[in-house]
Amino acid sequence: MEGKEEDVRLGANKFSERHAIGTAAQGTDDKDYKEPPPAPLFEPGELKSWSFYRPGIAEFVATFLFLYISILTVMGVSKSTSKCATVGIQGIAWSFGGMILALVYCTAGISGHINPAVTFGLFLARKLSLTRAVFYIIMQCLGAICGRGVVKGFQQGLYMGNGGRRNVVAPGYTKGDGLGAEIVGTFILVYTVFSATDAKRRARDSHVPILAPLPIGFAVFLVHLATMGITGTGINPARSLGAAVIYNQHHAWADHWIFWVGPFIGAALAAIYHQVIIRAIPFKSRS
C-alpha cells in the first residue's frame, strides 16, 4: 500500500529535489528559491496604473523592430539575382533569431514576449493576468503591422512582388503538415522560454538571467532553419497577421488560421509540459 500511496503523491513532496552536477546548487537547502505566486485573472486597478501600459508599449516597439529588421533581410535576399551574394537561408534564420536575442535582452526586465504565443503560454501558466495578456497581444499585433508597413513603404514593388513574404503552406505540403510544423516549432520556442526564465534555475545559477536571451534566440534560429521550407516559419501570430494585413491580396488570408491555431496549441502544450512534467507544480504542497 505504501507504493500505491507514493504513486498517488508522485513523490513530489516526499523526496528532496536533486541538483545537477556542476551547478551552484550543490550543498544548498532543499528549496533555496521562492516560486512566484500565480497572477490573478483580473488585477483590480491595473488599468489605472502606468506600470500596466509600459510593458505594452515595449511590446509594440520590440515587435516593430523585430519585423522591420528581419523582413528587410528577407527582402535583401529576394532582391539579389545571386543567392551566393546574399546571407542566404542561414542569414534569414539568424536575422529572426538574432533580433529576438537582442530584443529579449533589452526588454526582459519589463516584458520581453514579442510574440502572442509566448504571452498565451505564460498566461496559461498564471504568469500574468488576462488583461495584461490581451493588451500585450494587441500591442504585438499593432507593432507587427507597423513594422511590415514601413518595409513595404521602402520598397513597395519588391515587397508586393514577393507576396509580402506572408506565411503560407508551401506547395507539396498539406494544411495538416503546416499546422504540425507550427505546433512543434512553437512548442520548442515556448518551452525554451519557460526553461530560460524558470524561477528555480534563476535562483540557483546567478548567470542564467543574463544568458536567458541566448537560448531563446537560438530556438528561433533553429526552428526557422527547420520550417522555412514548410510554412515560411510563423511561430508568431503577430508576425503572420502583419504580413496578411499589409499584403492583403492573392490569398493572403487563405492559410492564416494555421498561424494562430498552431502556435497557440504549441504554446499550450509547452506550458502544460513545463508546469506539470518538468516542475510538477500542481502536485507540490502549498506549505
From Swiss-Prot:
<feature type="transmembrane region" description="Helical; Name=5">
    <location>
        <begin position="210"/>
        <end position="230"/>
    </location>
</feature>
<feature type="transmembrane region" description="Helical; Name=4">
    <location>
        <begin position="176"/>
        <end position="196"/>
    </location>
</feature>
<feature type="transmembrane region" description="Helical; Name=6">
    <location>
        <begin position="258"/>
        <end position="278"/>
    </location>
</feature>
<dbReference type="Pfam" id="PF00230">
    <property type="entry name" value="MIP"/>
</dbReference>
<dbReference type="GO" id="GO:0051290">
    <property type="term" value="P:protein heterotetramerization"/>
</dbReference>
<comment type="similarity">
    <text>Belongs to the MIP/aquaporin (TC 1.A.8) family. PIP (TC 1.A.8.11) subfamily.</text>
</comment>
<dbReference type="GO" id="GO:0032991">
    <property type="term" value="C:protein-containing complex"/>
</dbReference>
<dbReference type="GO" id="GO:0009414">
    <property type="term" value="P:response to water deprivation"/>
</dbReference>
<dbReference type="GO" id="GO:0015250">
    <property type="term" value="F:water channel activity"/>
</dbReference>
<comment type="function">
    <text>Water channel required to facilitate the transport of water across cell membrane. Active as heteromers with PIP1-2, but not as homomers.</text>
</comment>
<keyword id="KW-1133">Transmembrane helix</keyword>
<keyword id="KW-1003">Cell membrane</keyword>
<dbReference type="InterPro" id="IPR022357">
    <property type="entry name" value="MIP_CS"/>
</dbReference>
<dbReference type="GO" id="GO:0051289">
    <property type="term" value="P:protein homotetramerization"/>
</dbReference>
<keyword id="KW-0813">Transport</keyword>
<keyword id="KW-0677">Repeat</keyword>
<feature type="short sequence motif" description="NPA 2">
    <location>
        <begin position="236"/>
        <end position="238"/>
    </location>
</feature>
<dbReference type="InterPro" id="IPR000425">
    <property type="entry name" value="MIP"/>
</dbReference>
<feature type="transmembrane region" description="Helical; Name=3">
    <location>
        <begin position="134"/>
        <end position="154"/>
    </location>
</feature>
<keyword id="KW-0812">Transmembrane</keyword>
<dbReference type="InterPro" id="IPR023271">
    <property type="entry name" value="Aquaporin-like"/>
</dbReference>
<protein>
    <recommendedName>
        <fullName>Aquaporin PIP1-1</fullName>
    </recommendedName>
</protein>
<feature type="transmembrane region" description="Helical; Name=2">
    <location>
        <begin position="92"/>
        <end position="114"/>
    </location>
</feature>
<dbReference type="InterPro" id="IPR034294">
    <property type="entry name" value="Aquaporin_transptr"/>
</dbReference>
<dbReference type="GO" id="GO:0005886">
    <property type="term" value="C:plasma membrane"/>
</dbReference>
<dbReference type="GO" id="GO:0016020">
    <property type="term" value="C:membrane"/>
</dbReference>
<dbReference type="GO" id="GO:0005829">
    <property type="term" value="C:cytosol"/>
</dbReference>
<comment type="subunit">
    <text>May interact with PIP1-2 to form heteromers.</text>
</comment>
<keyword id="KW-0472">Membrane</keyword>
<feature type="transmembrane region" description="Helical; Name=1">
    <location>
        <begin position="57"/>
        <end position="77"/>
    </location>
</feature>
<feature type="short sequence motif" description="NPA 1">
    <location>
        <begin position="115"/>
        <end position="117"/>
    </location>
</feature>
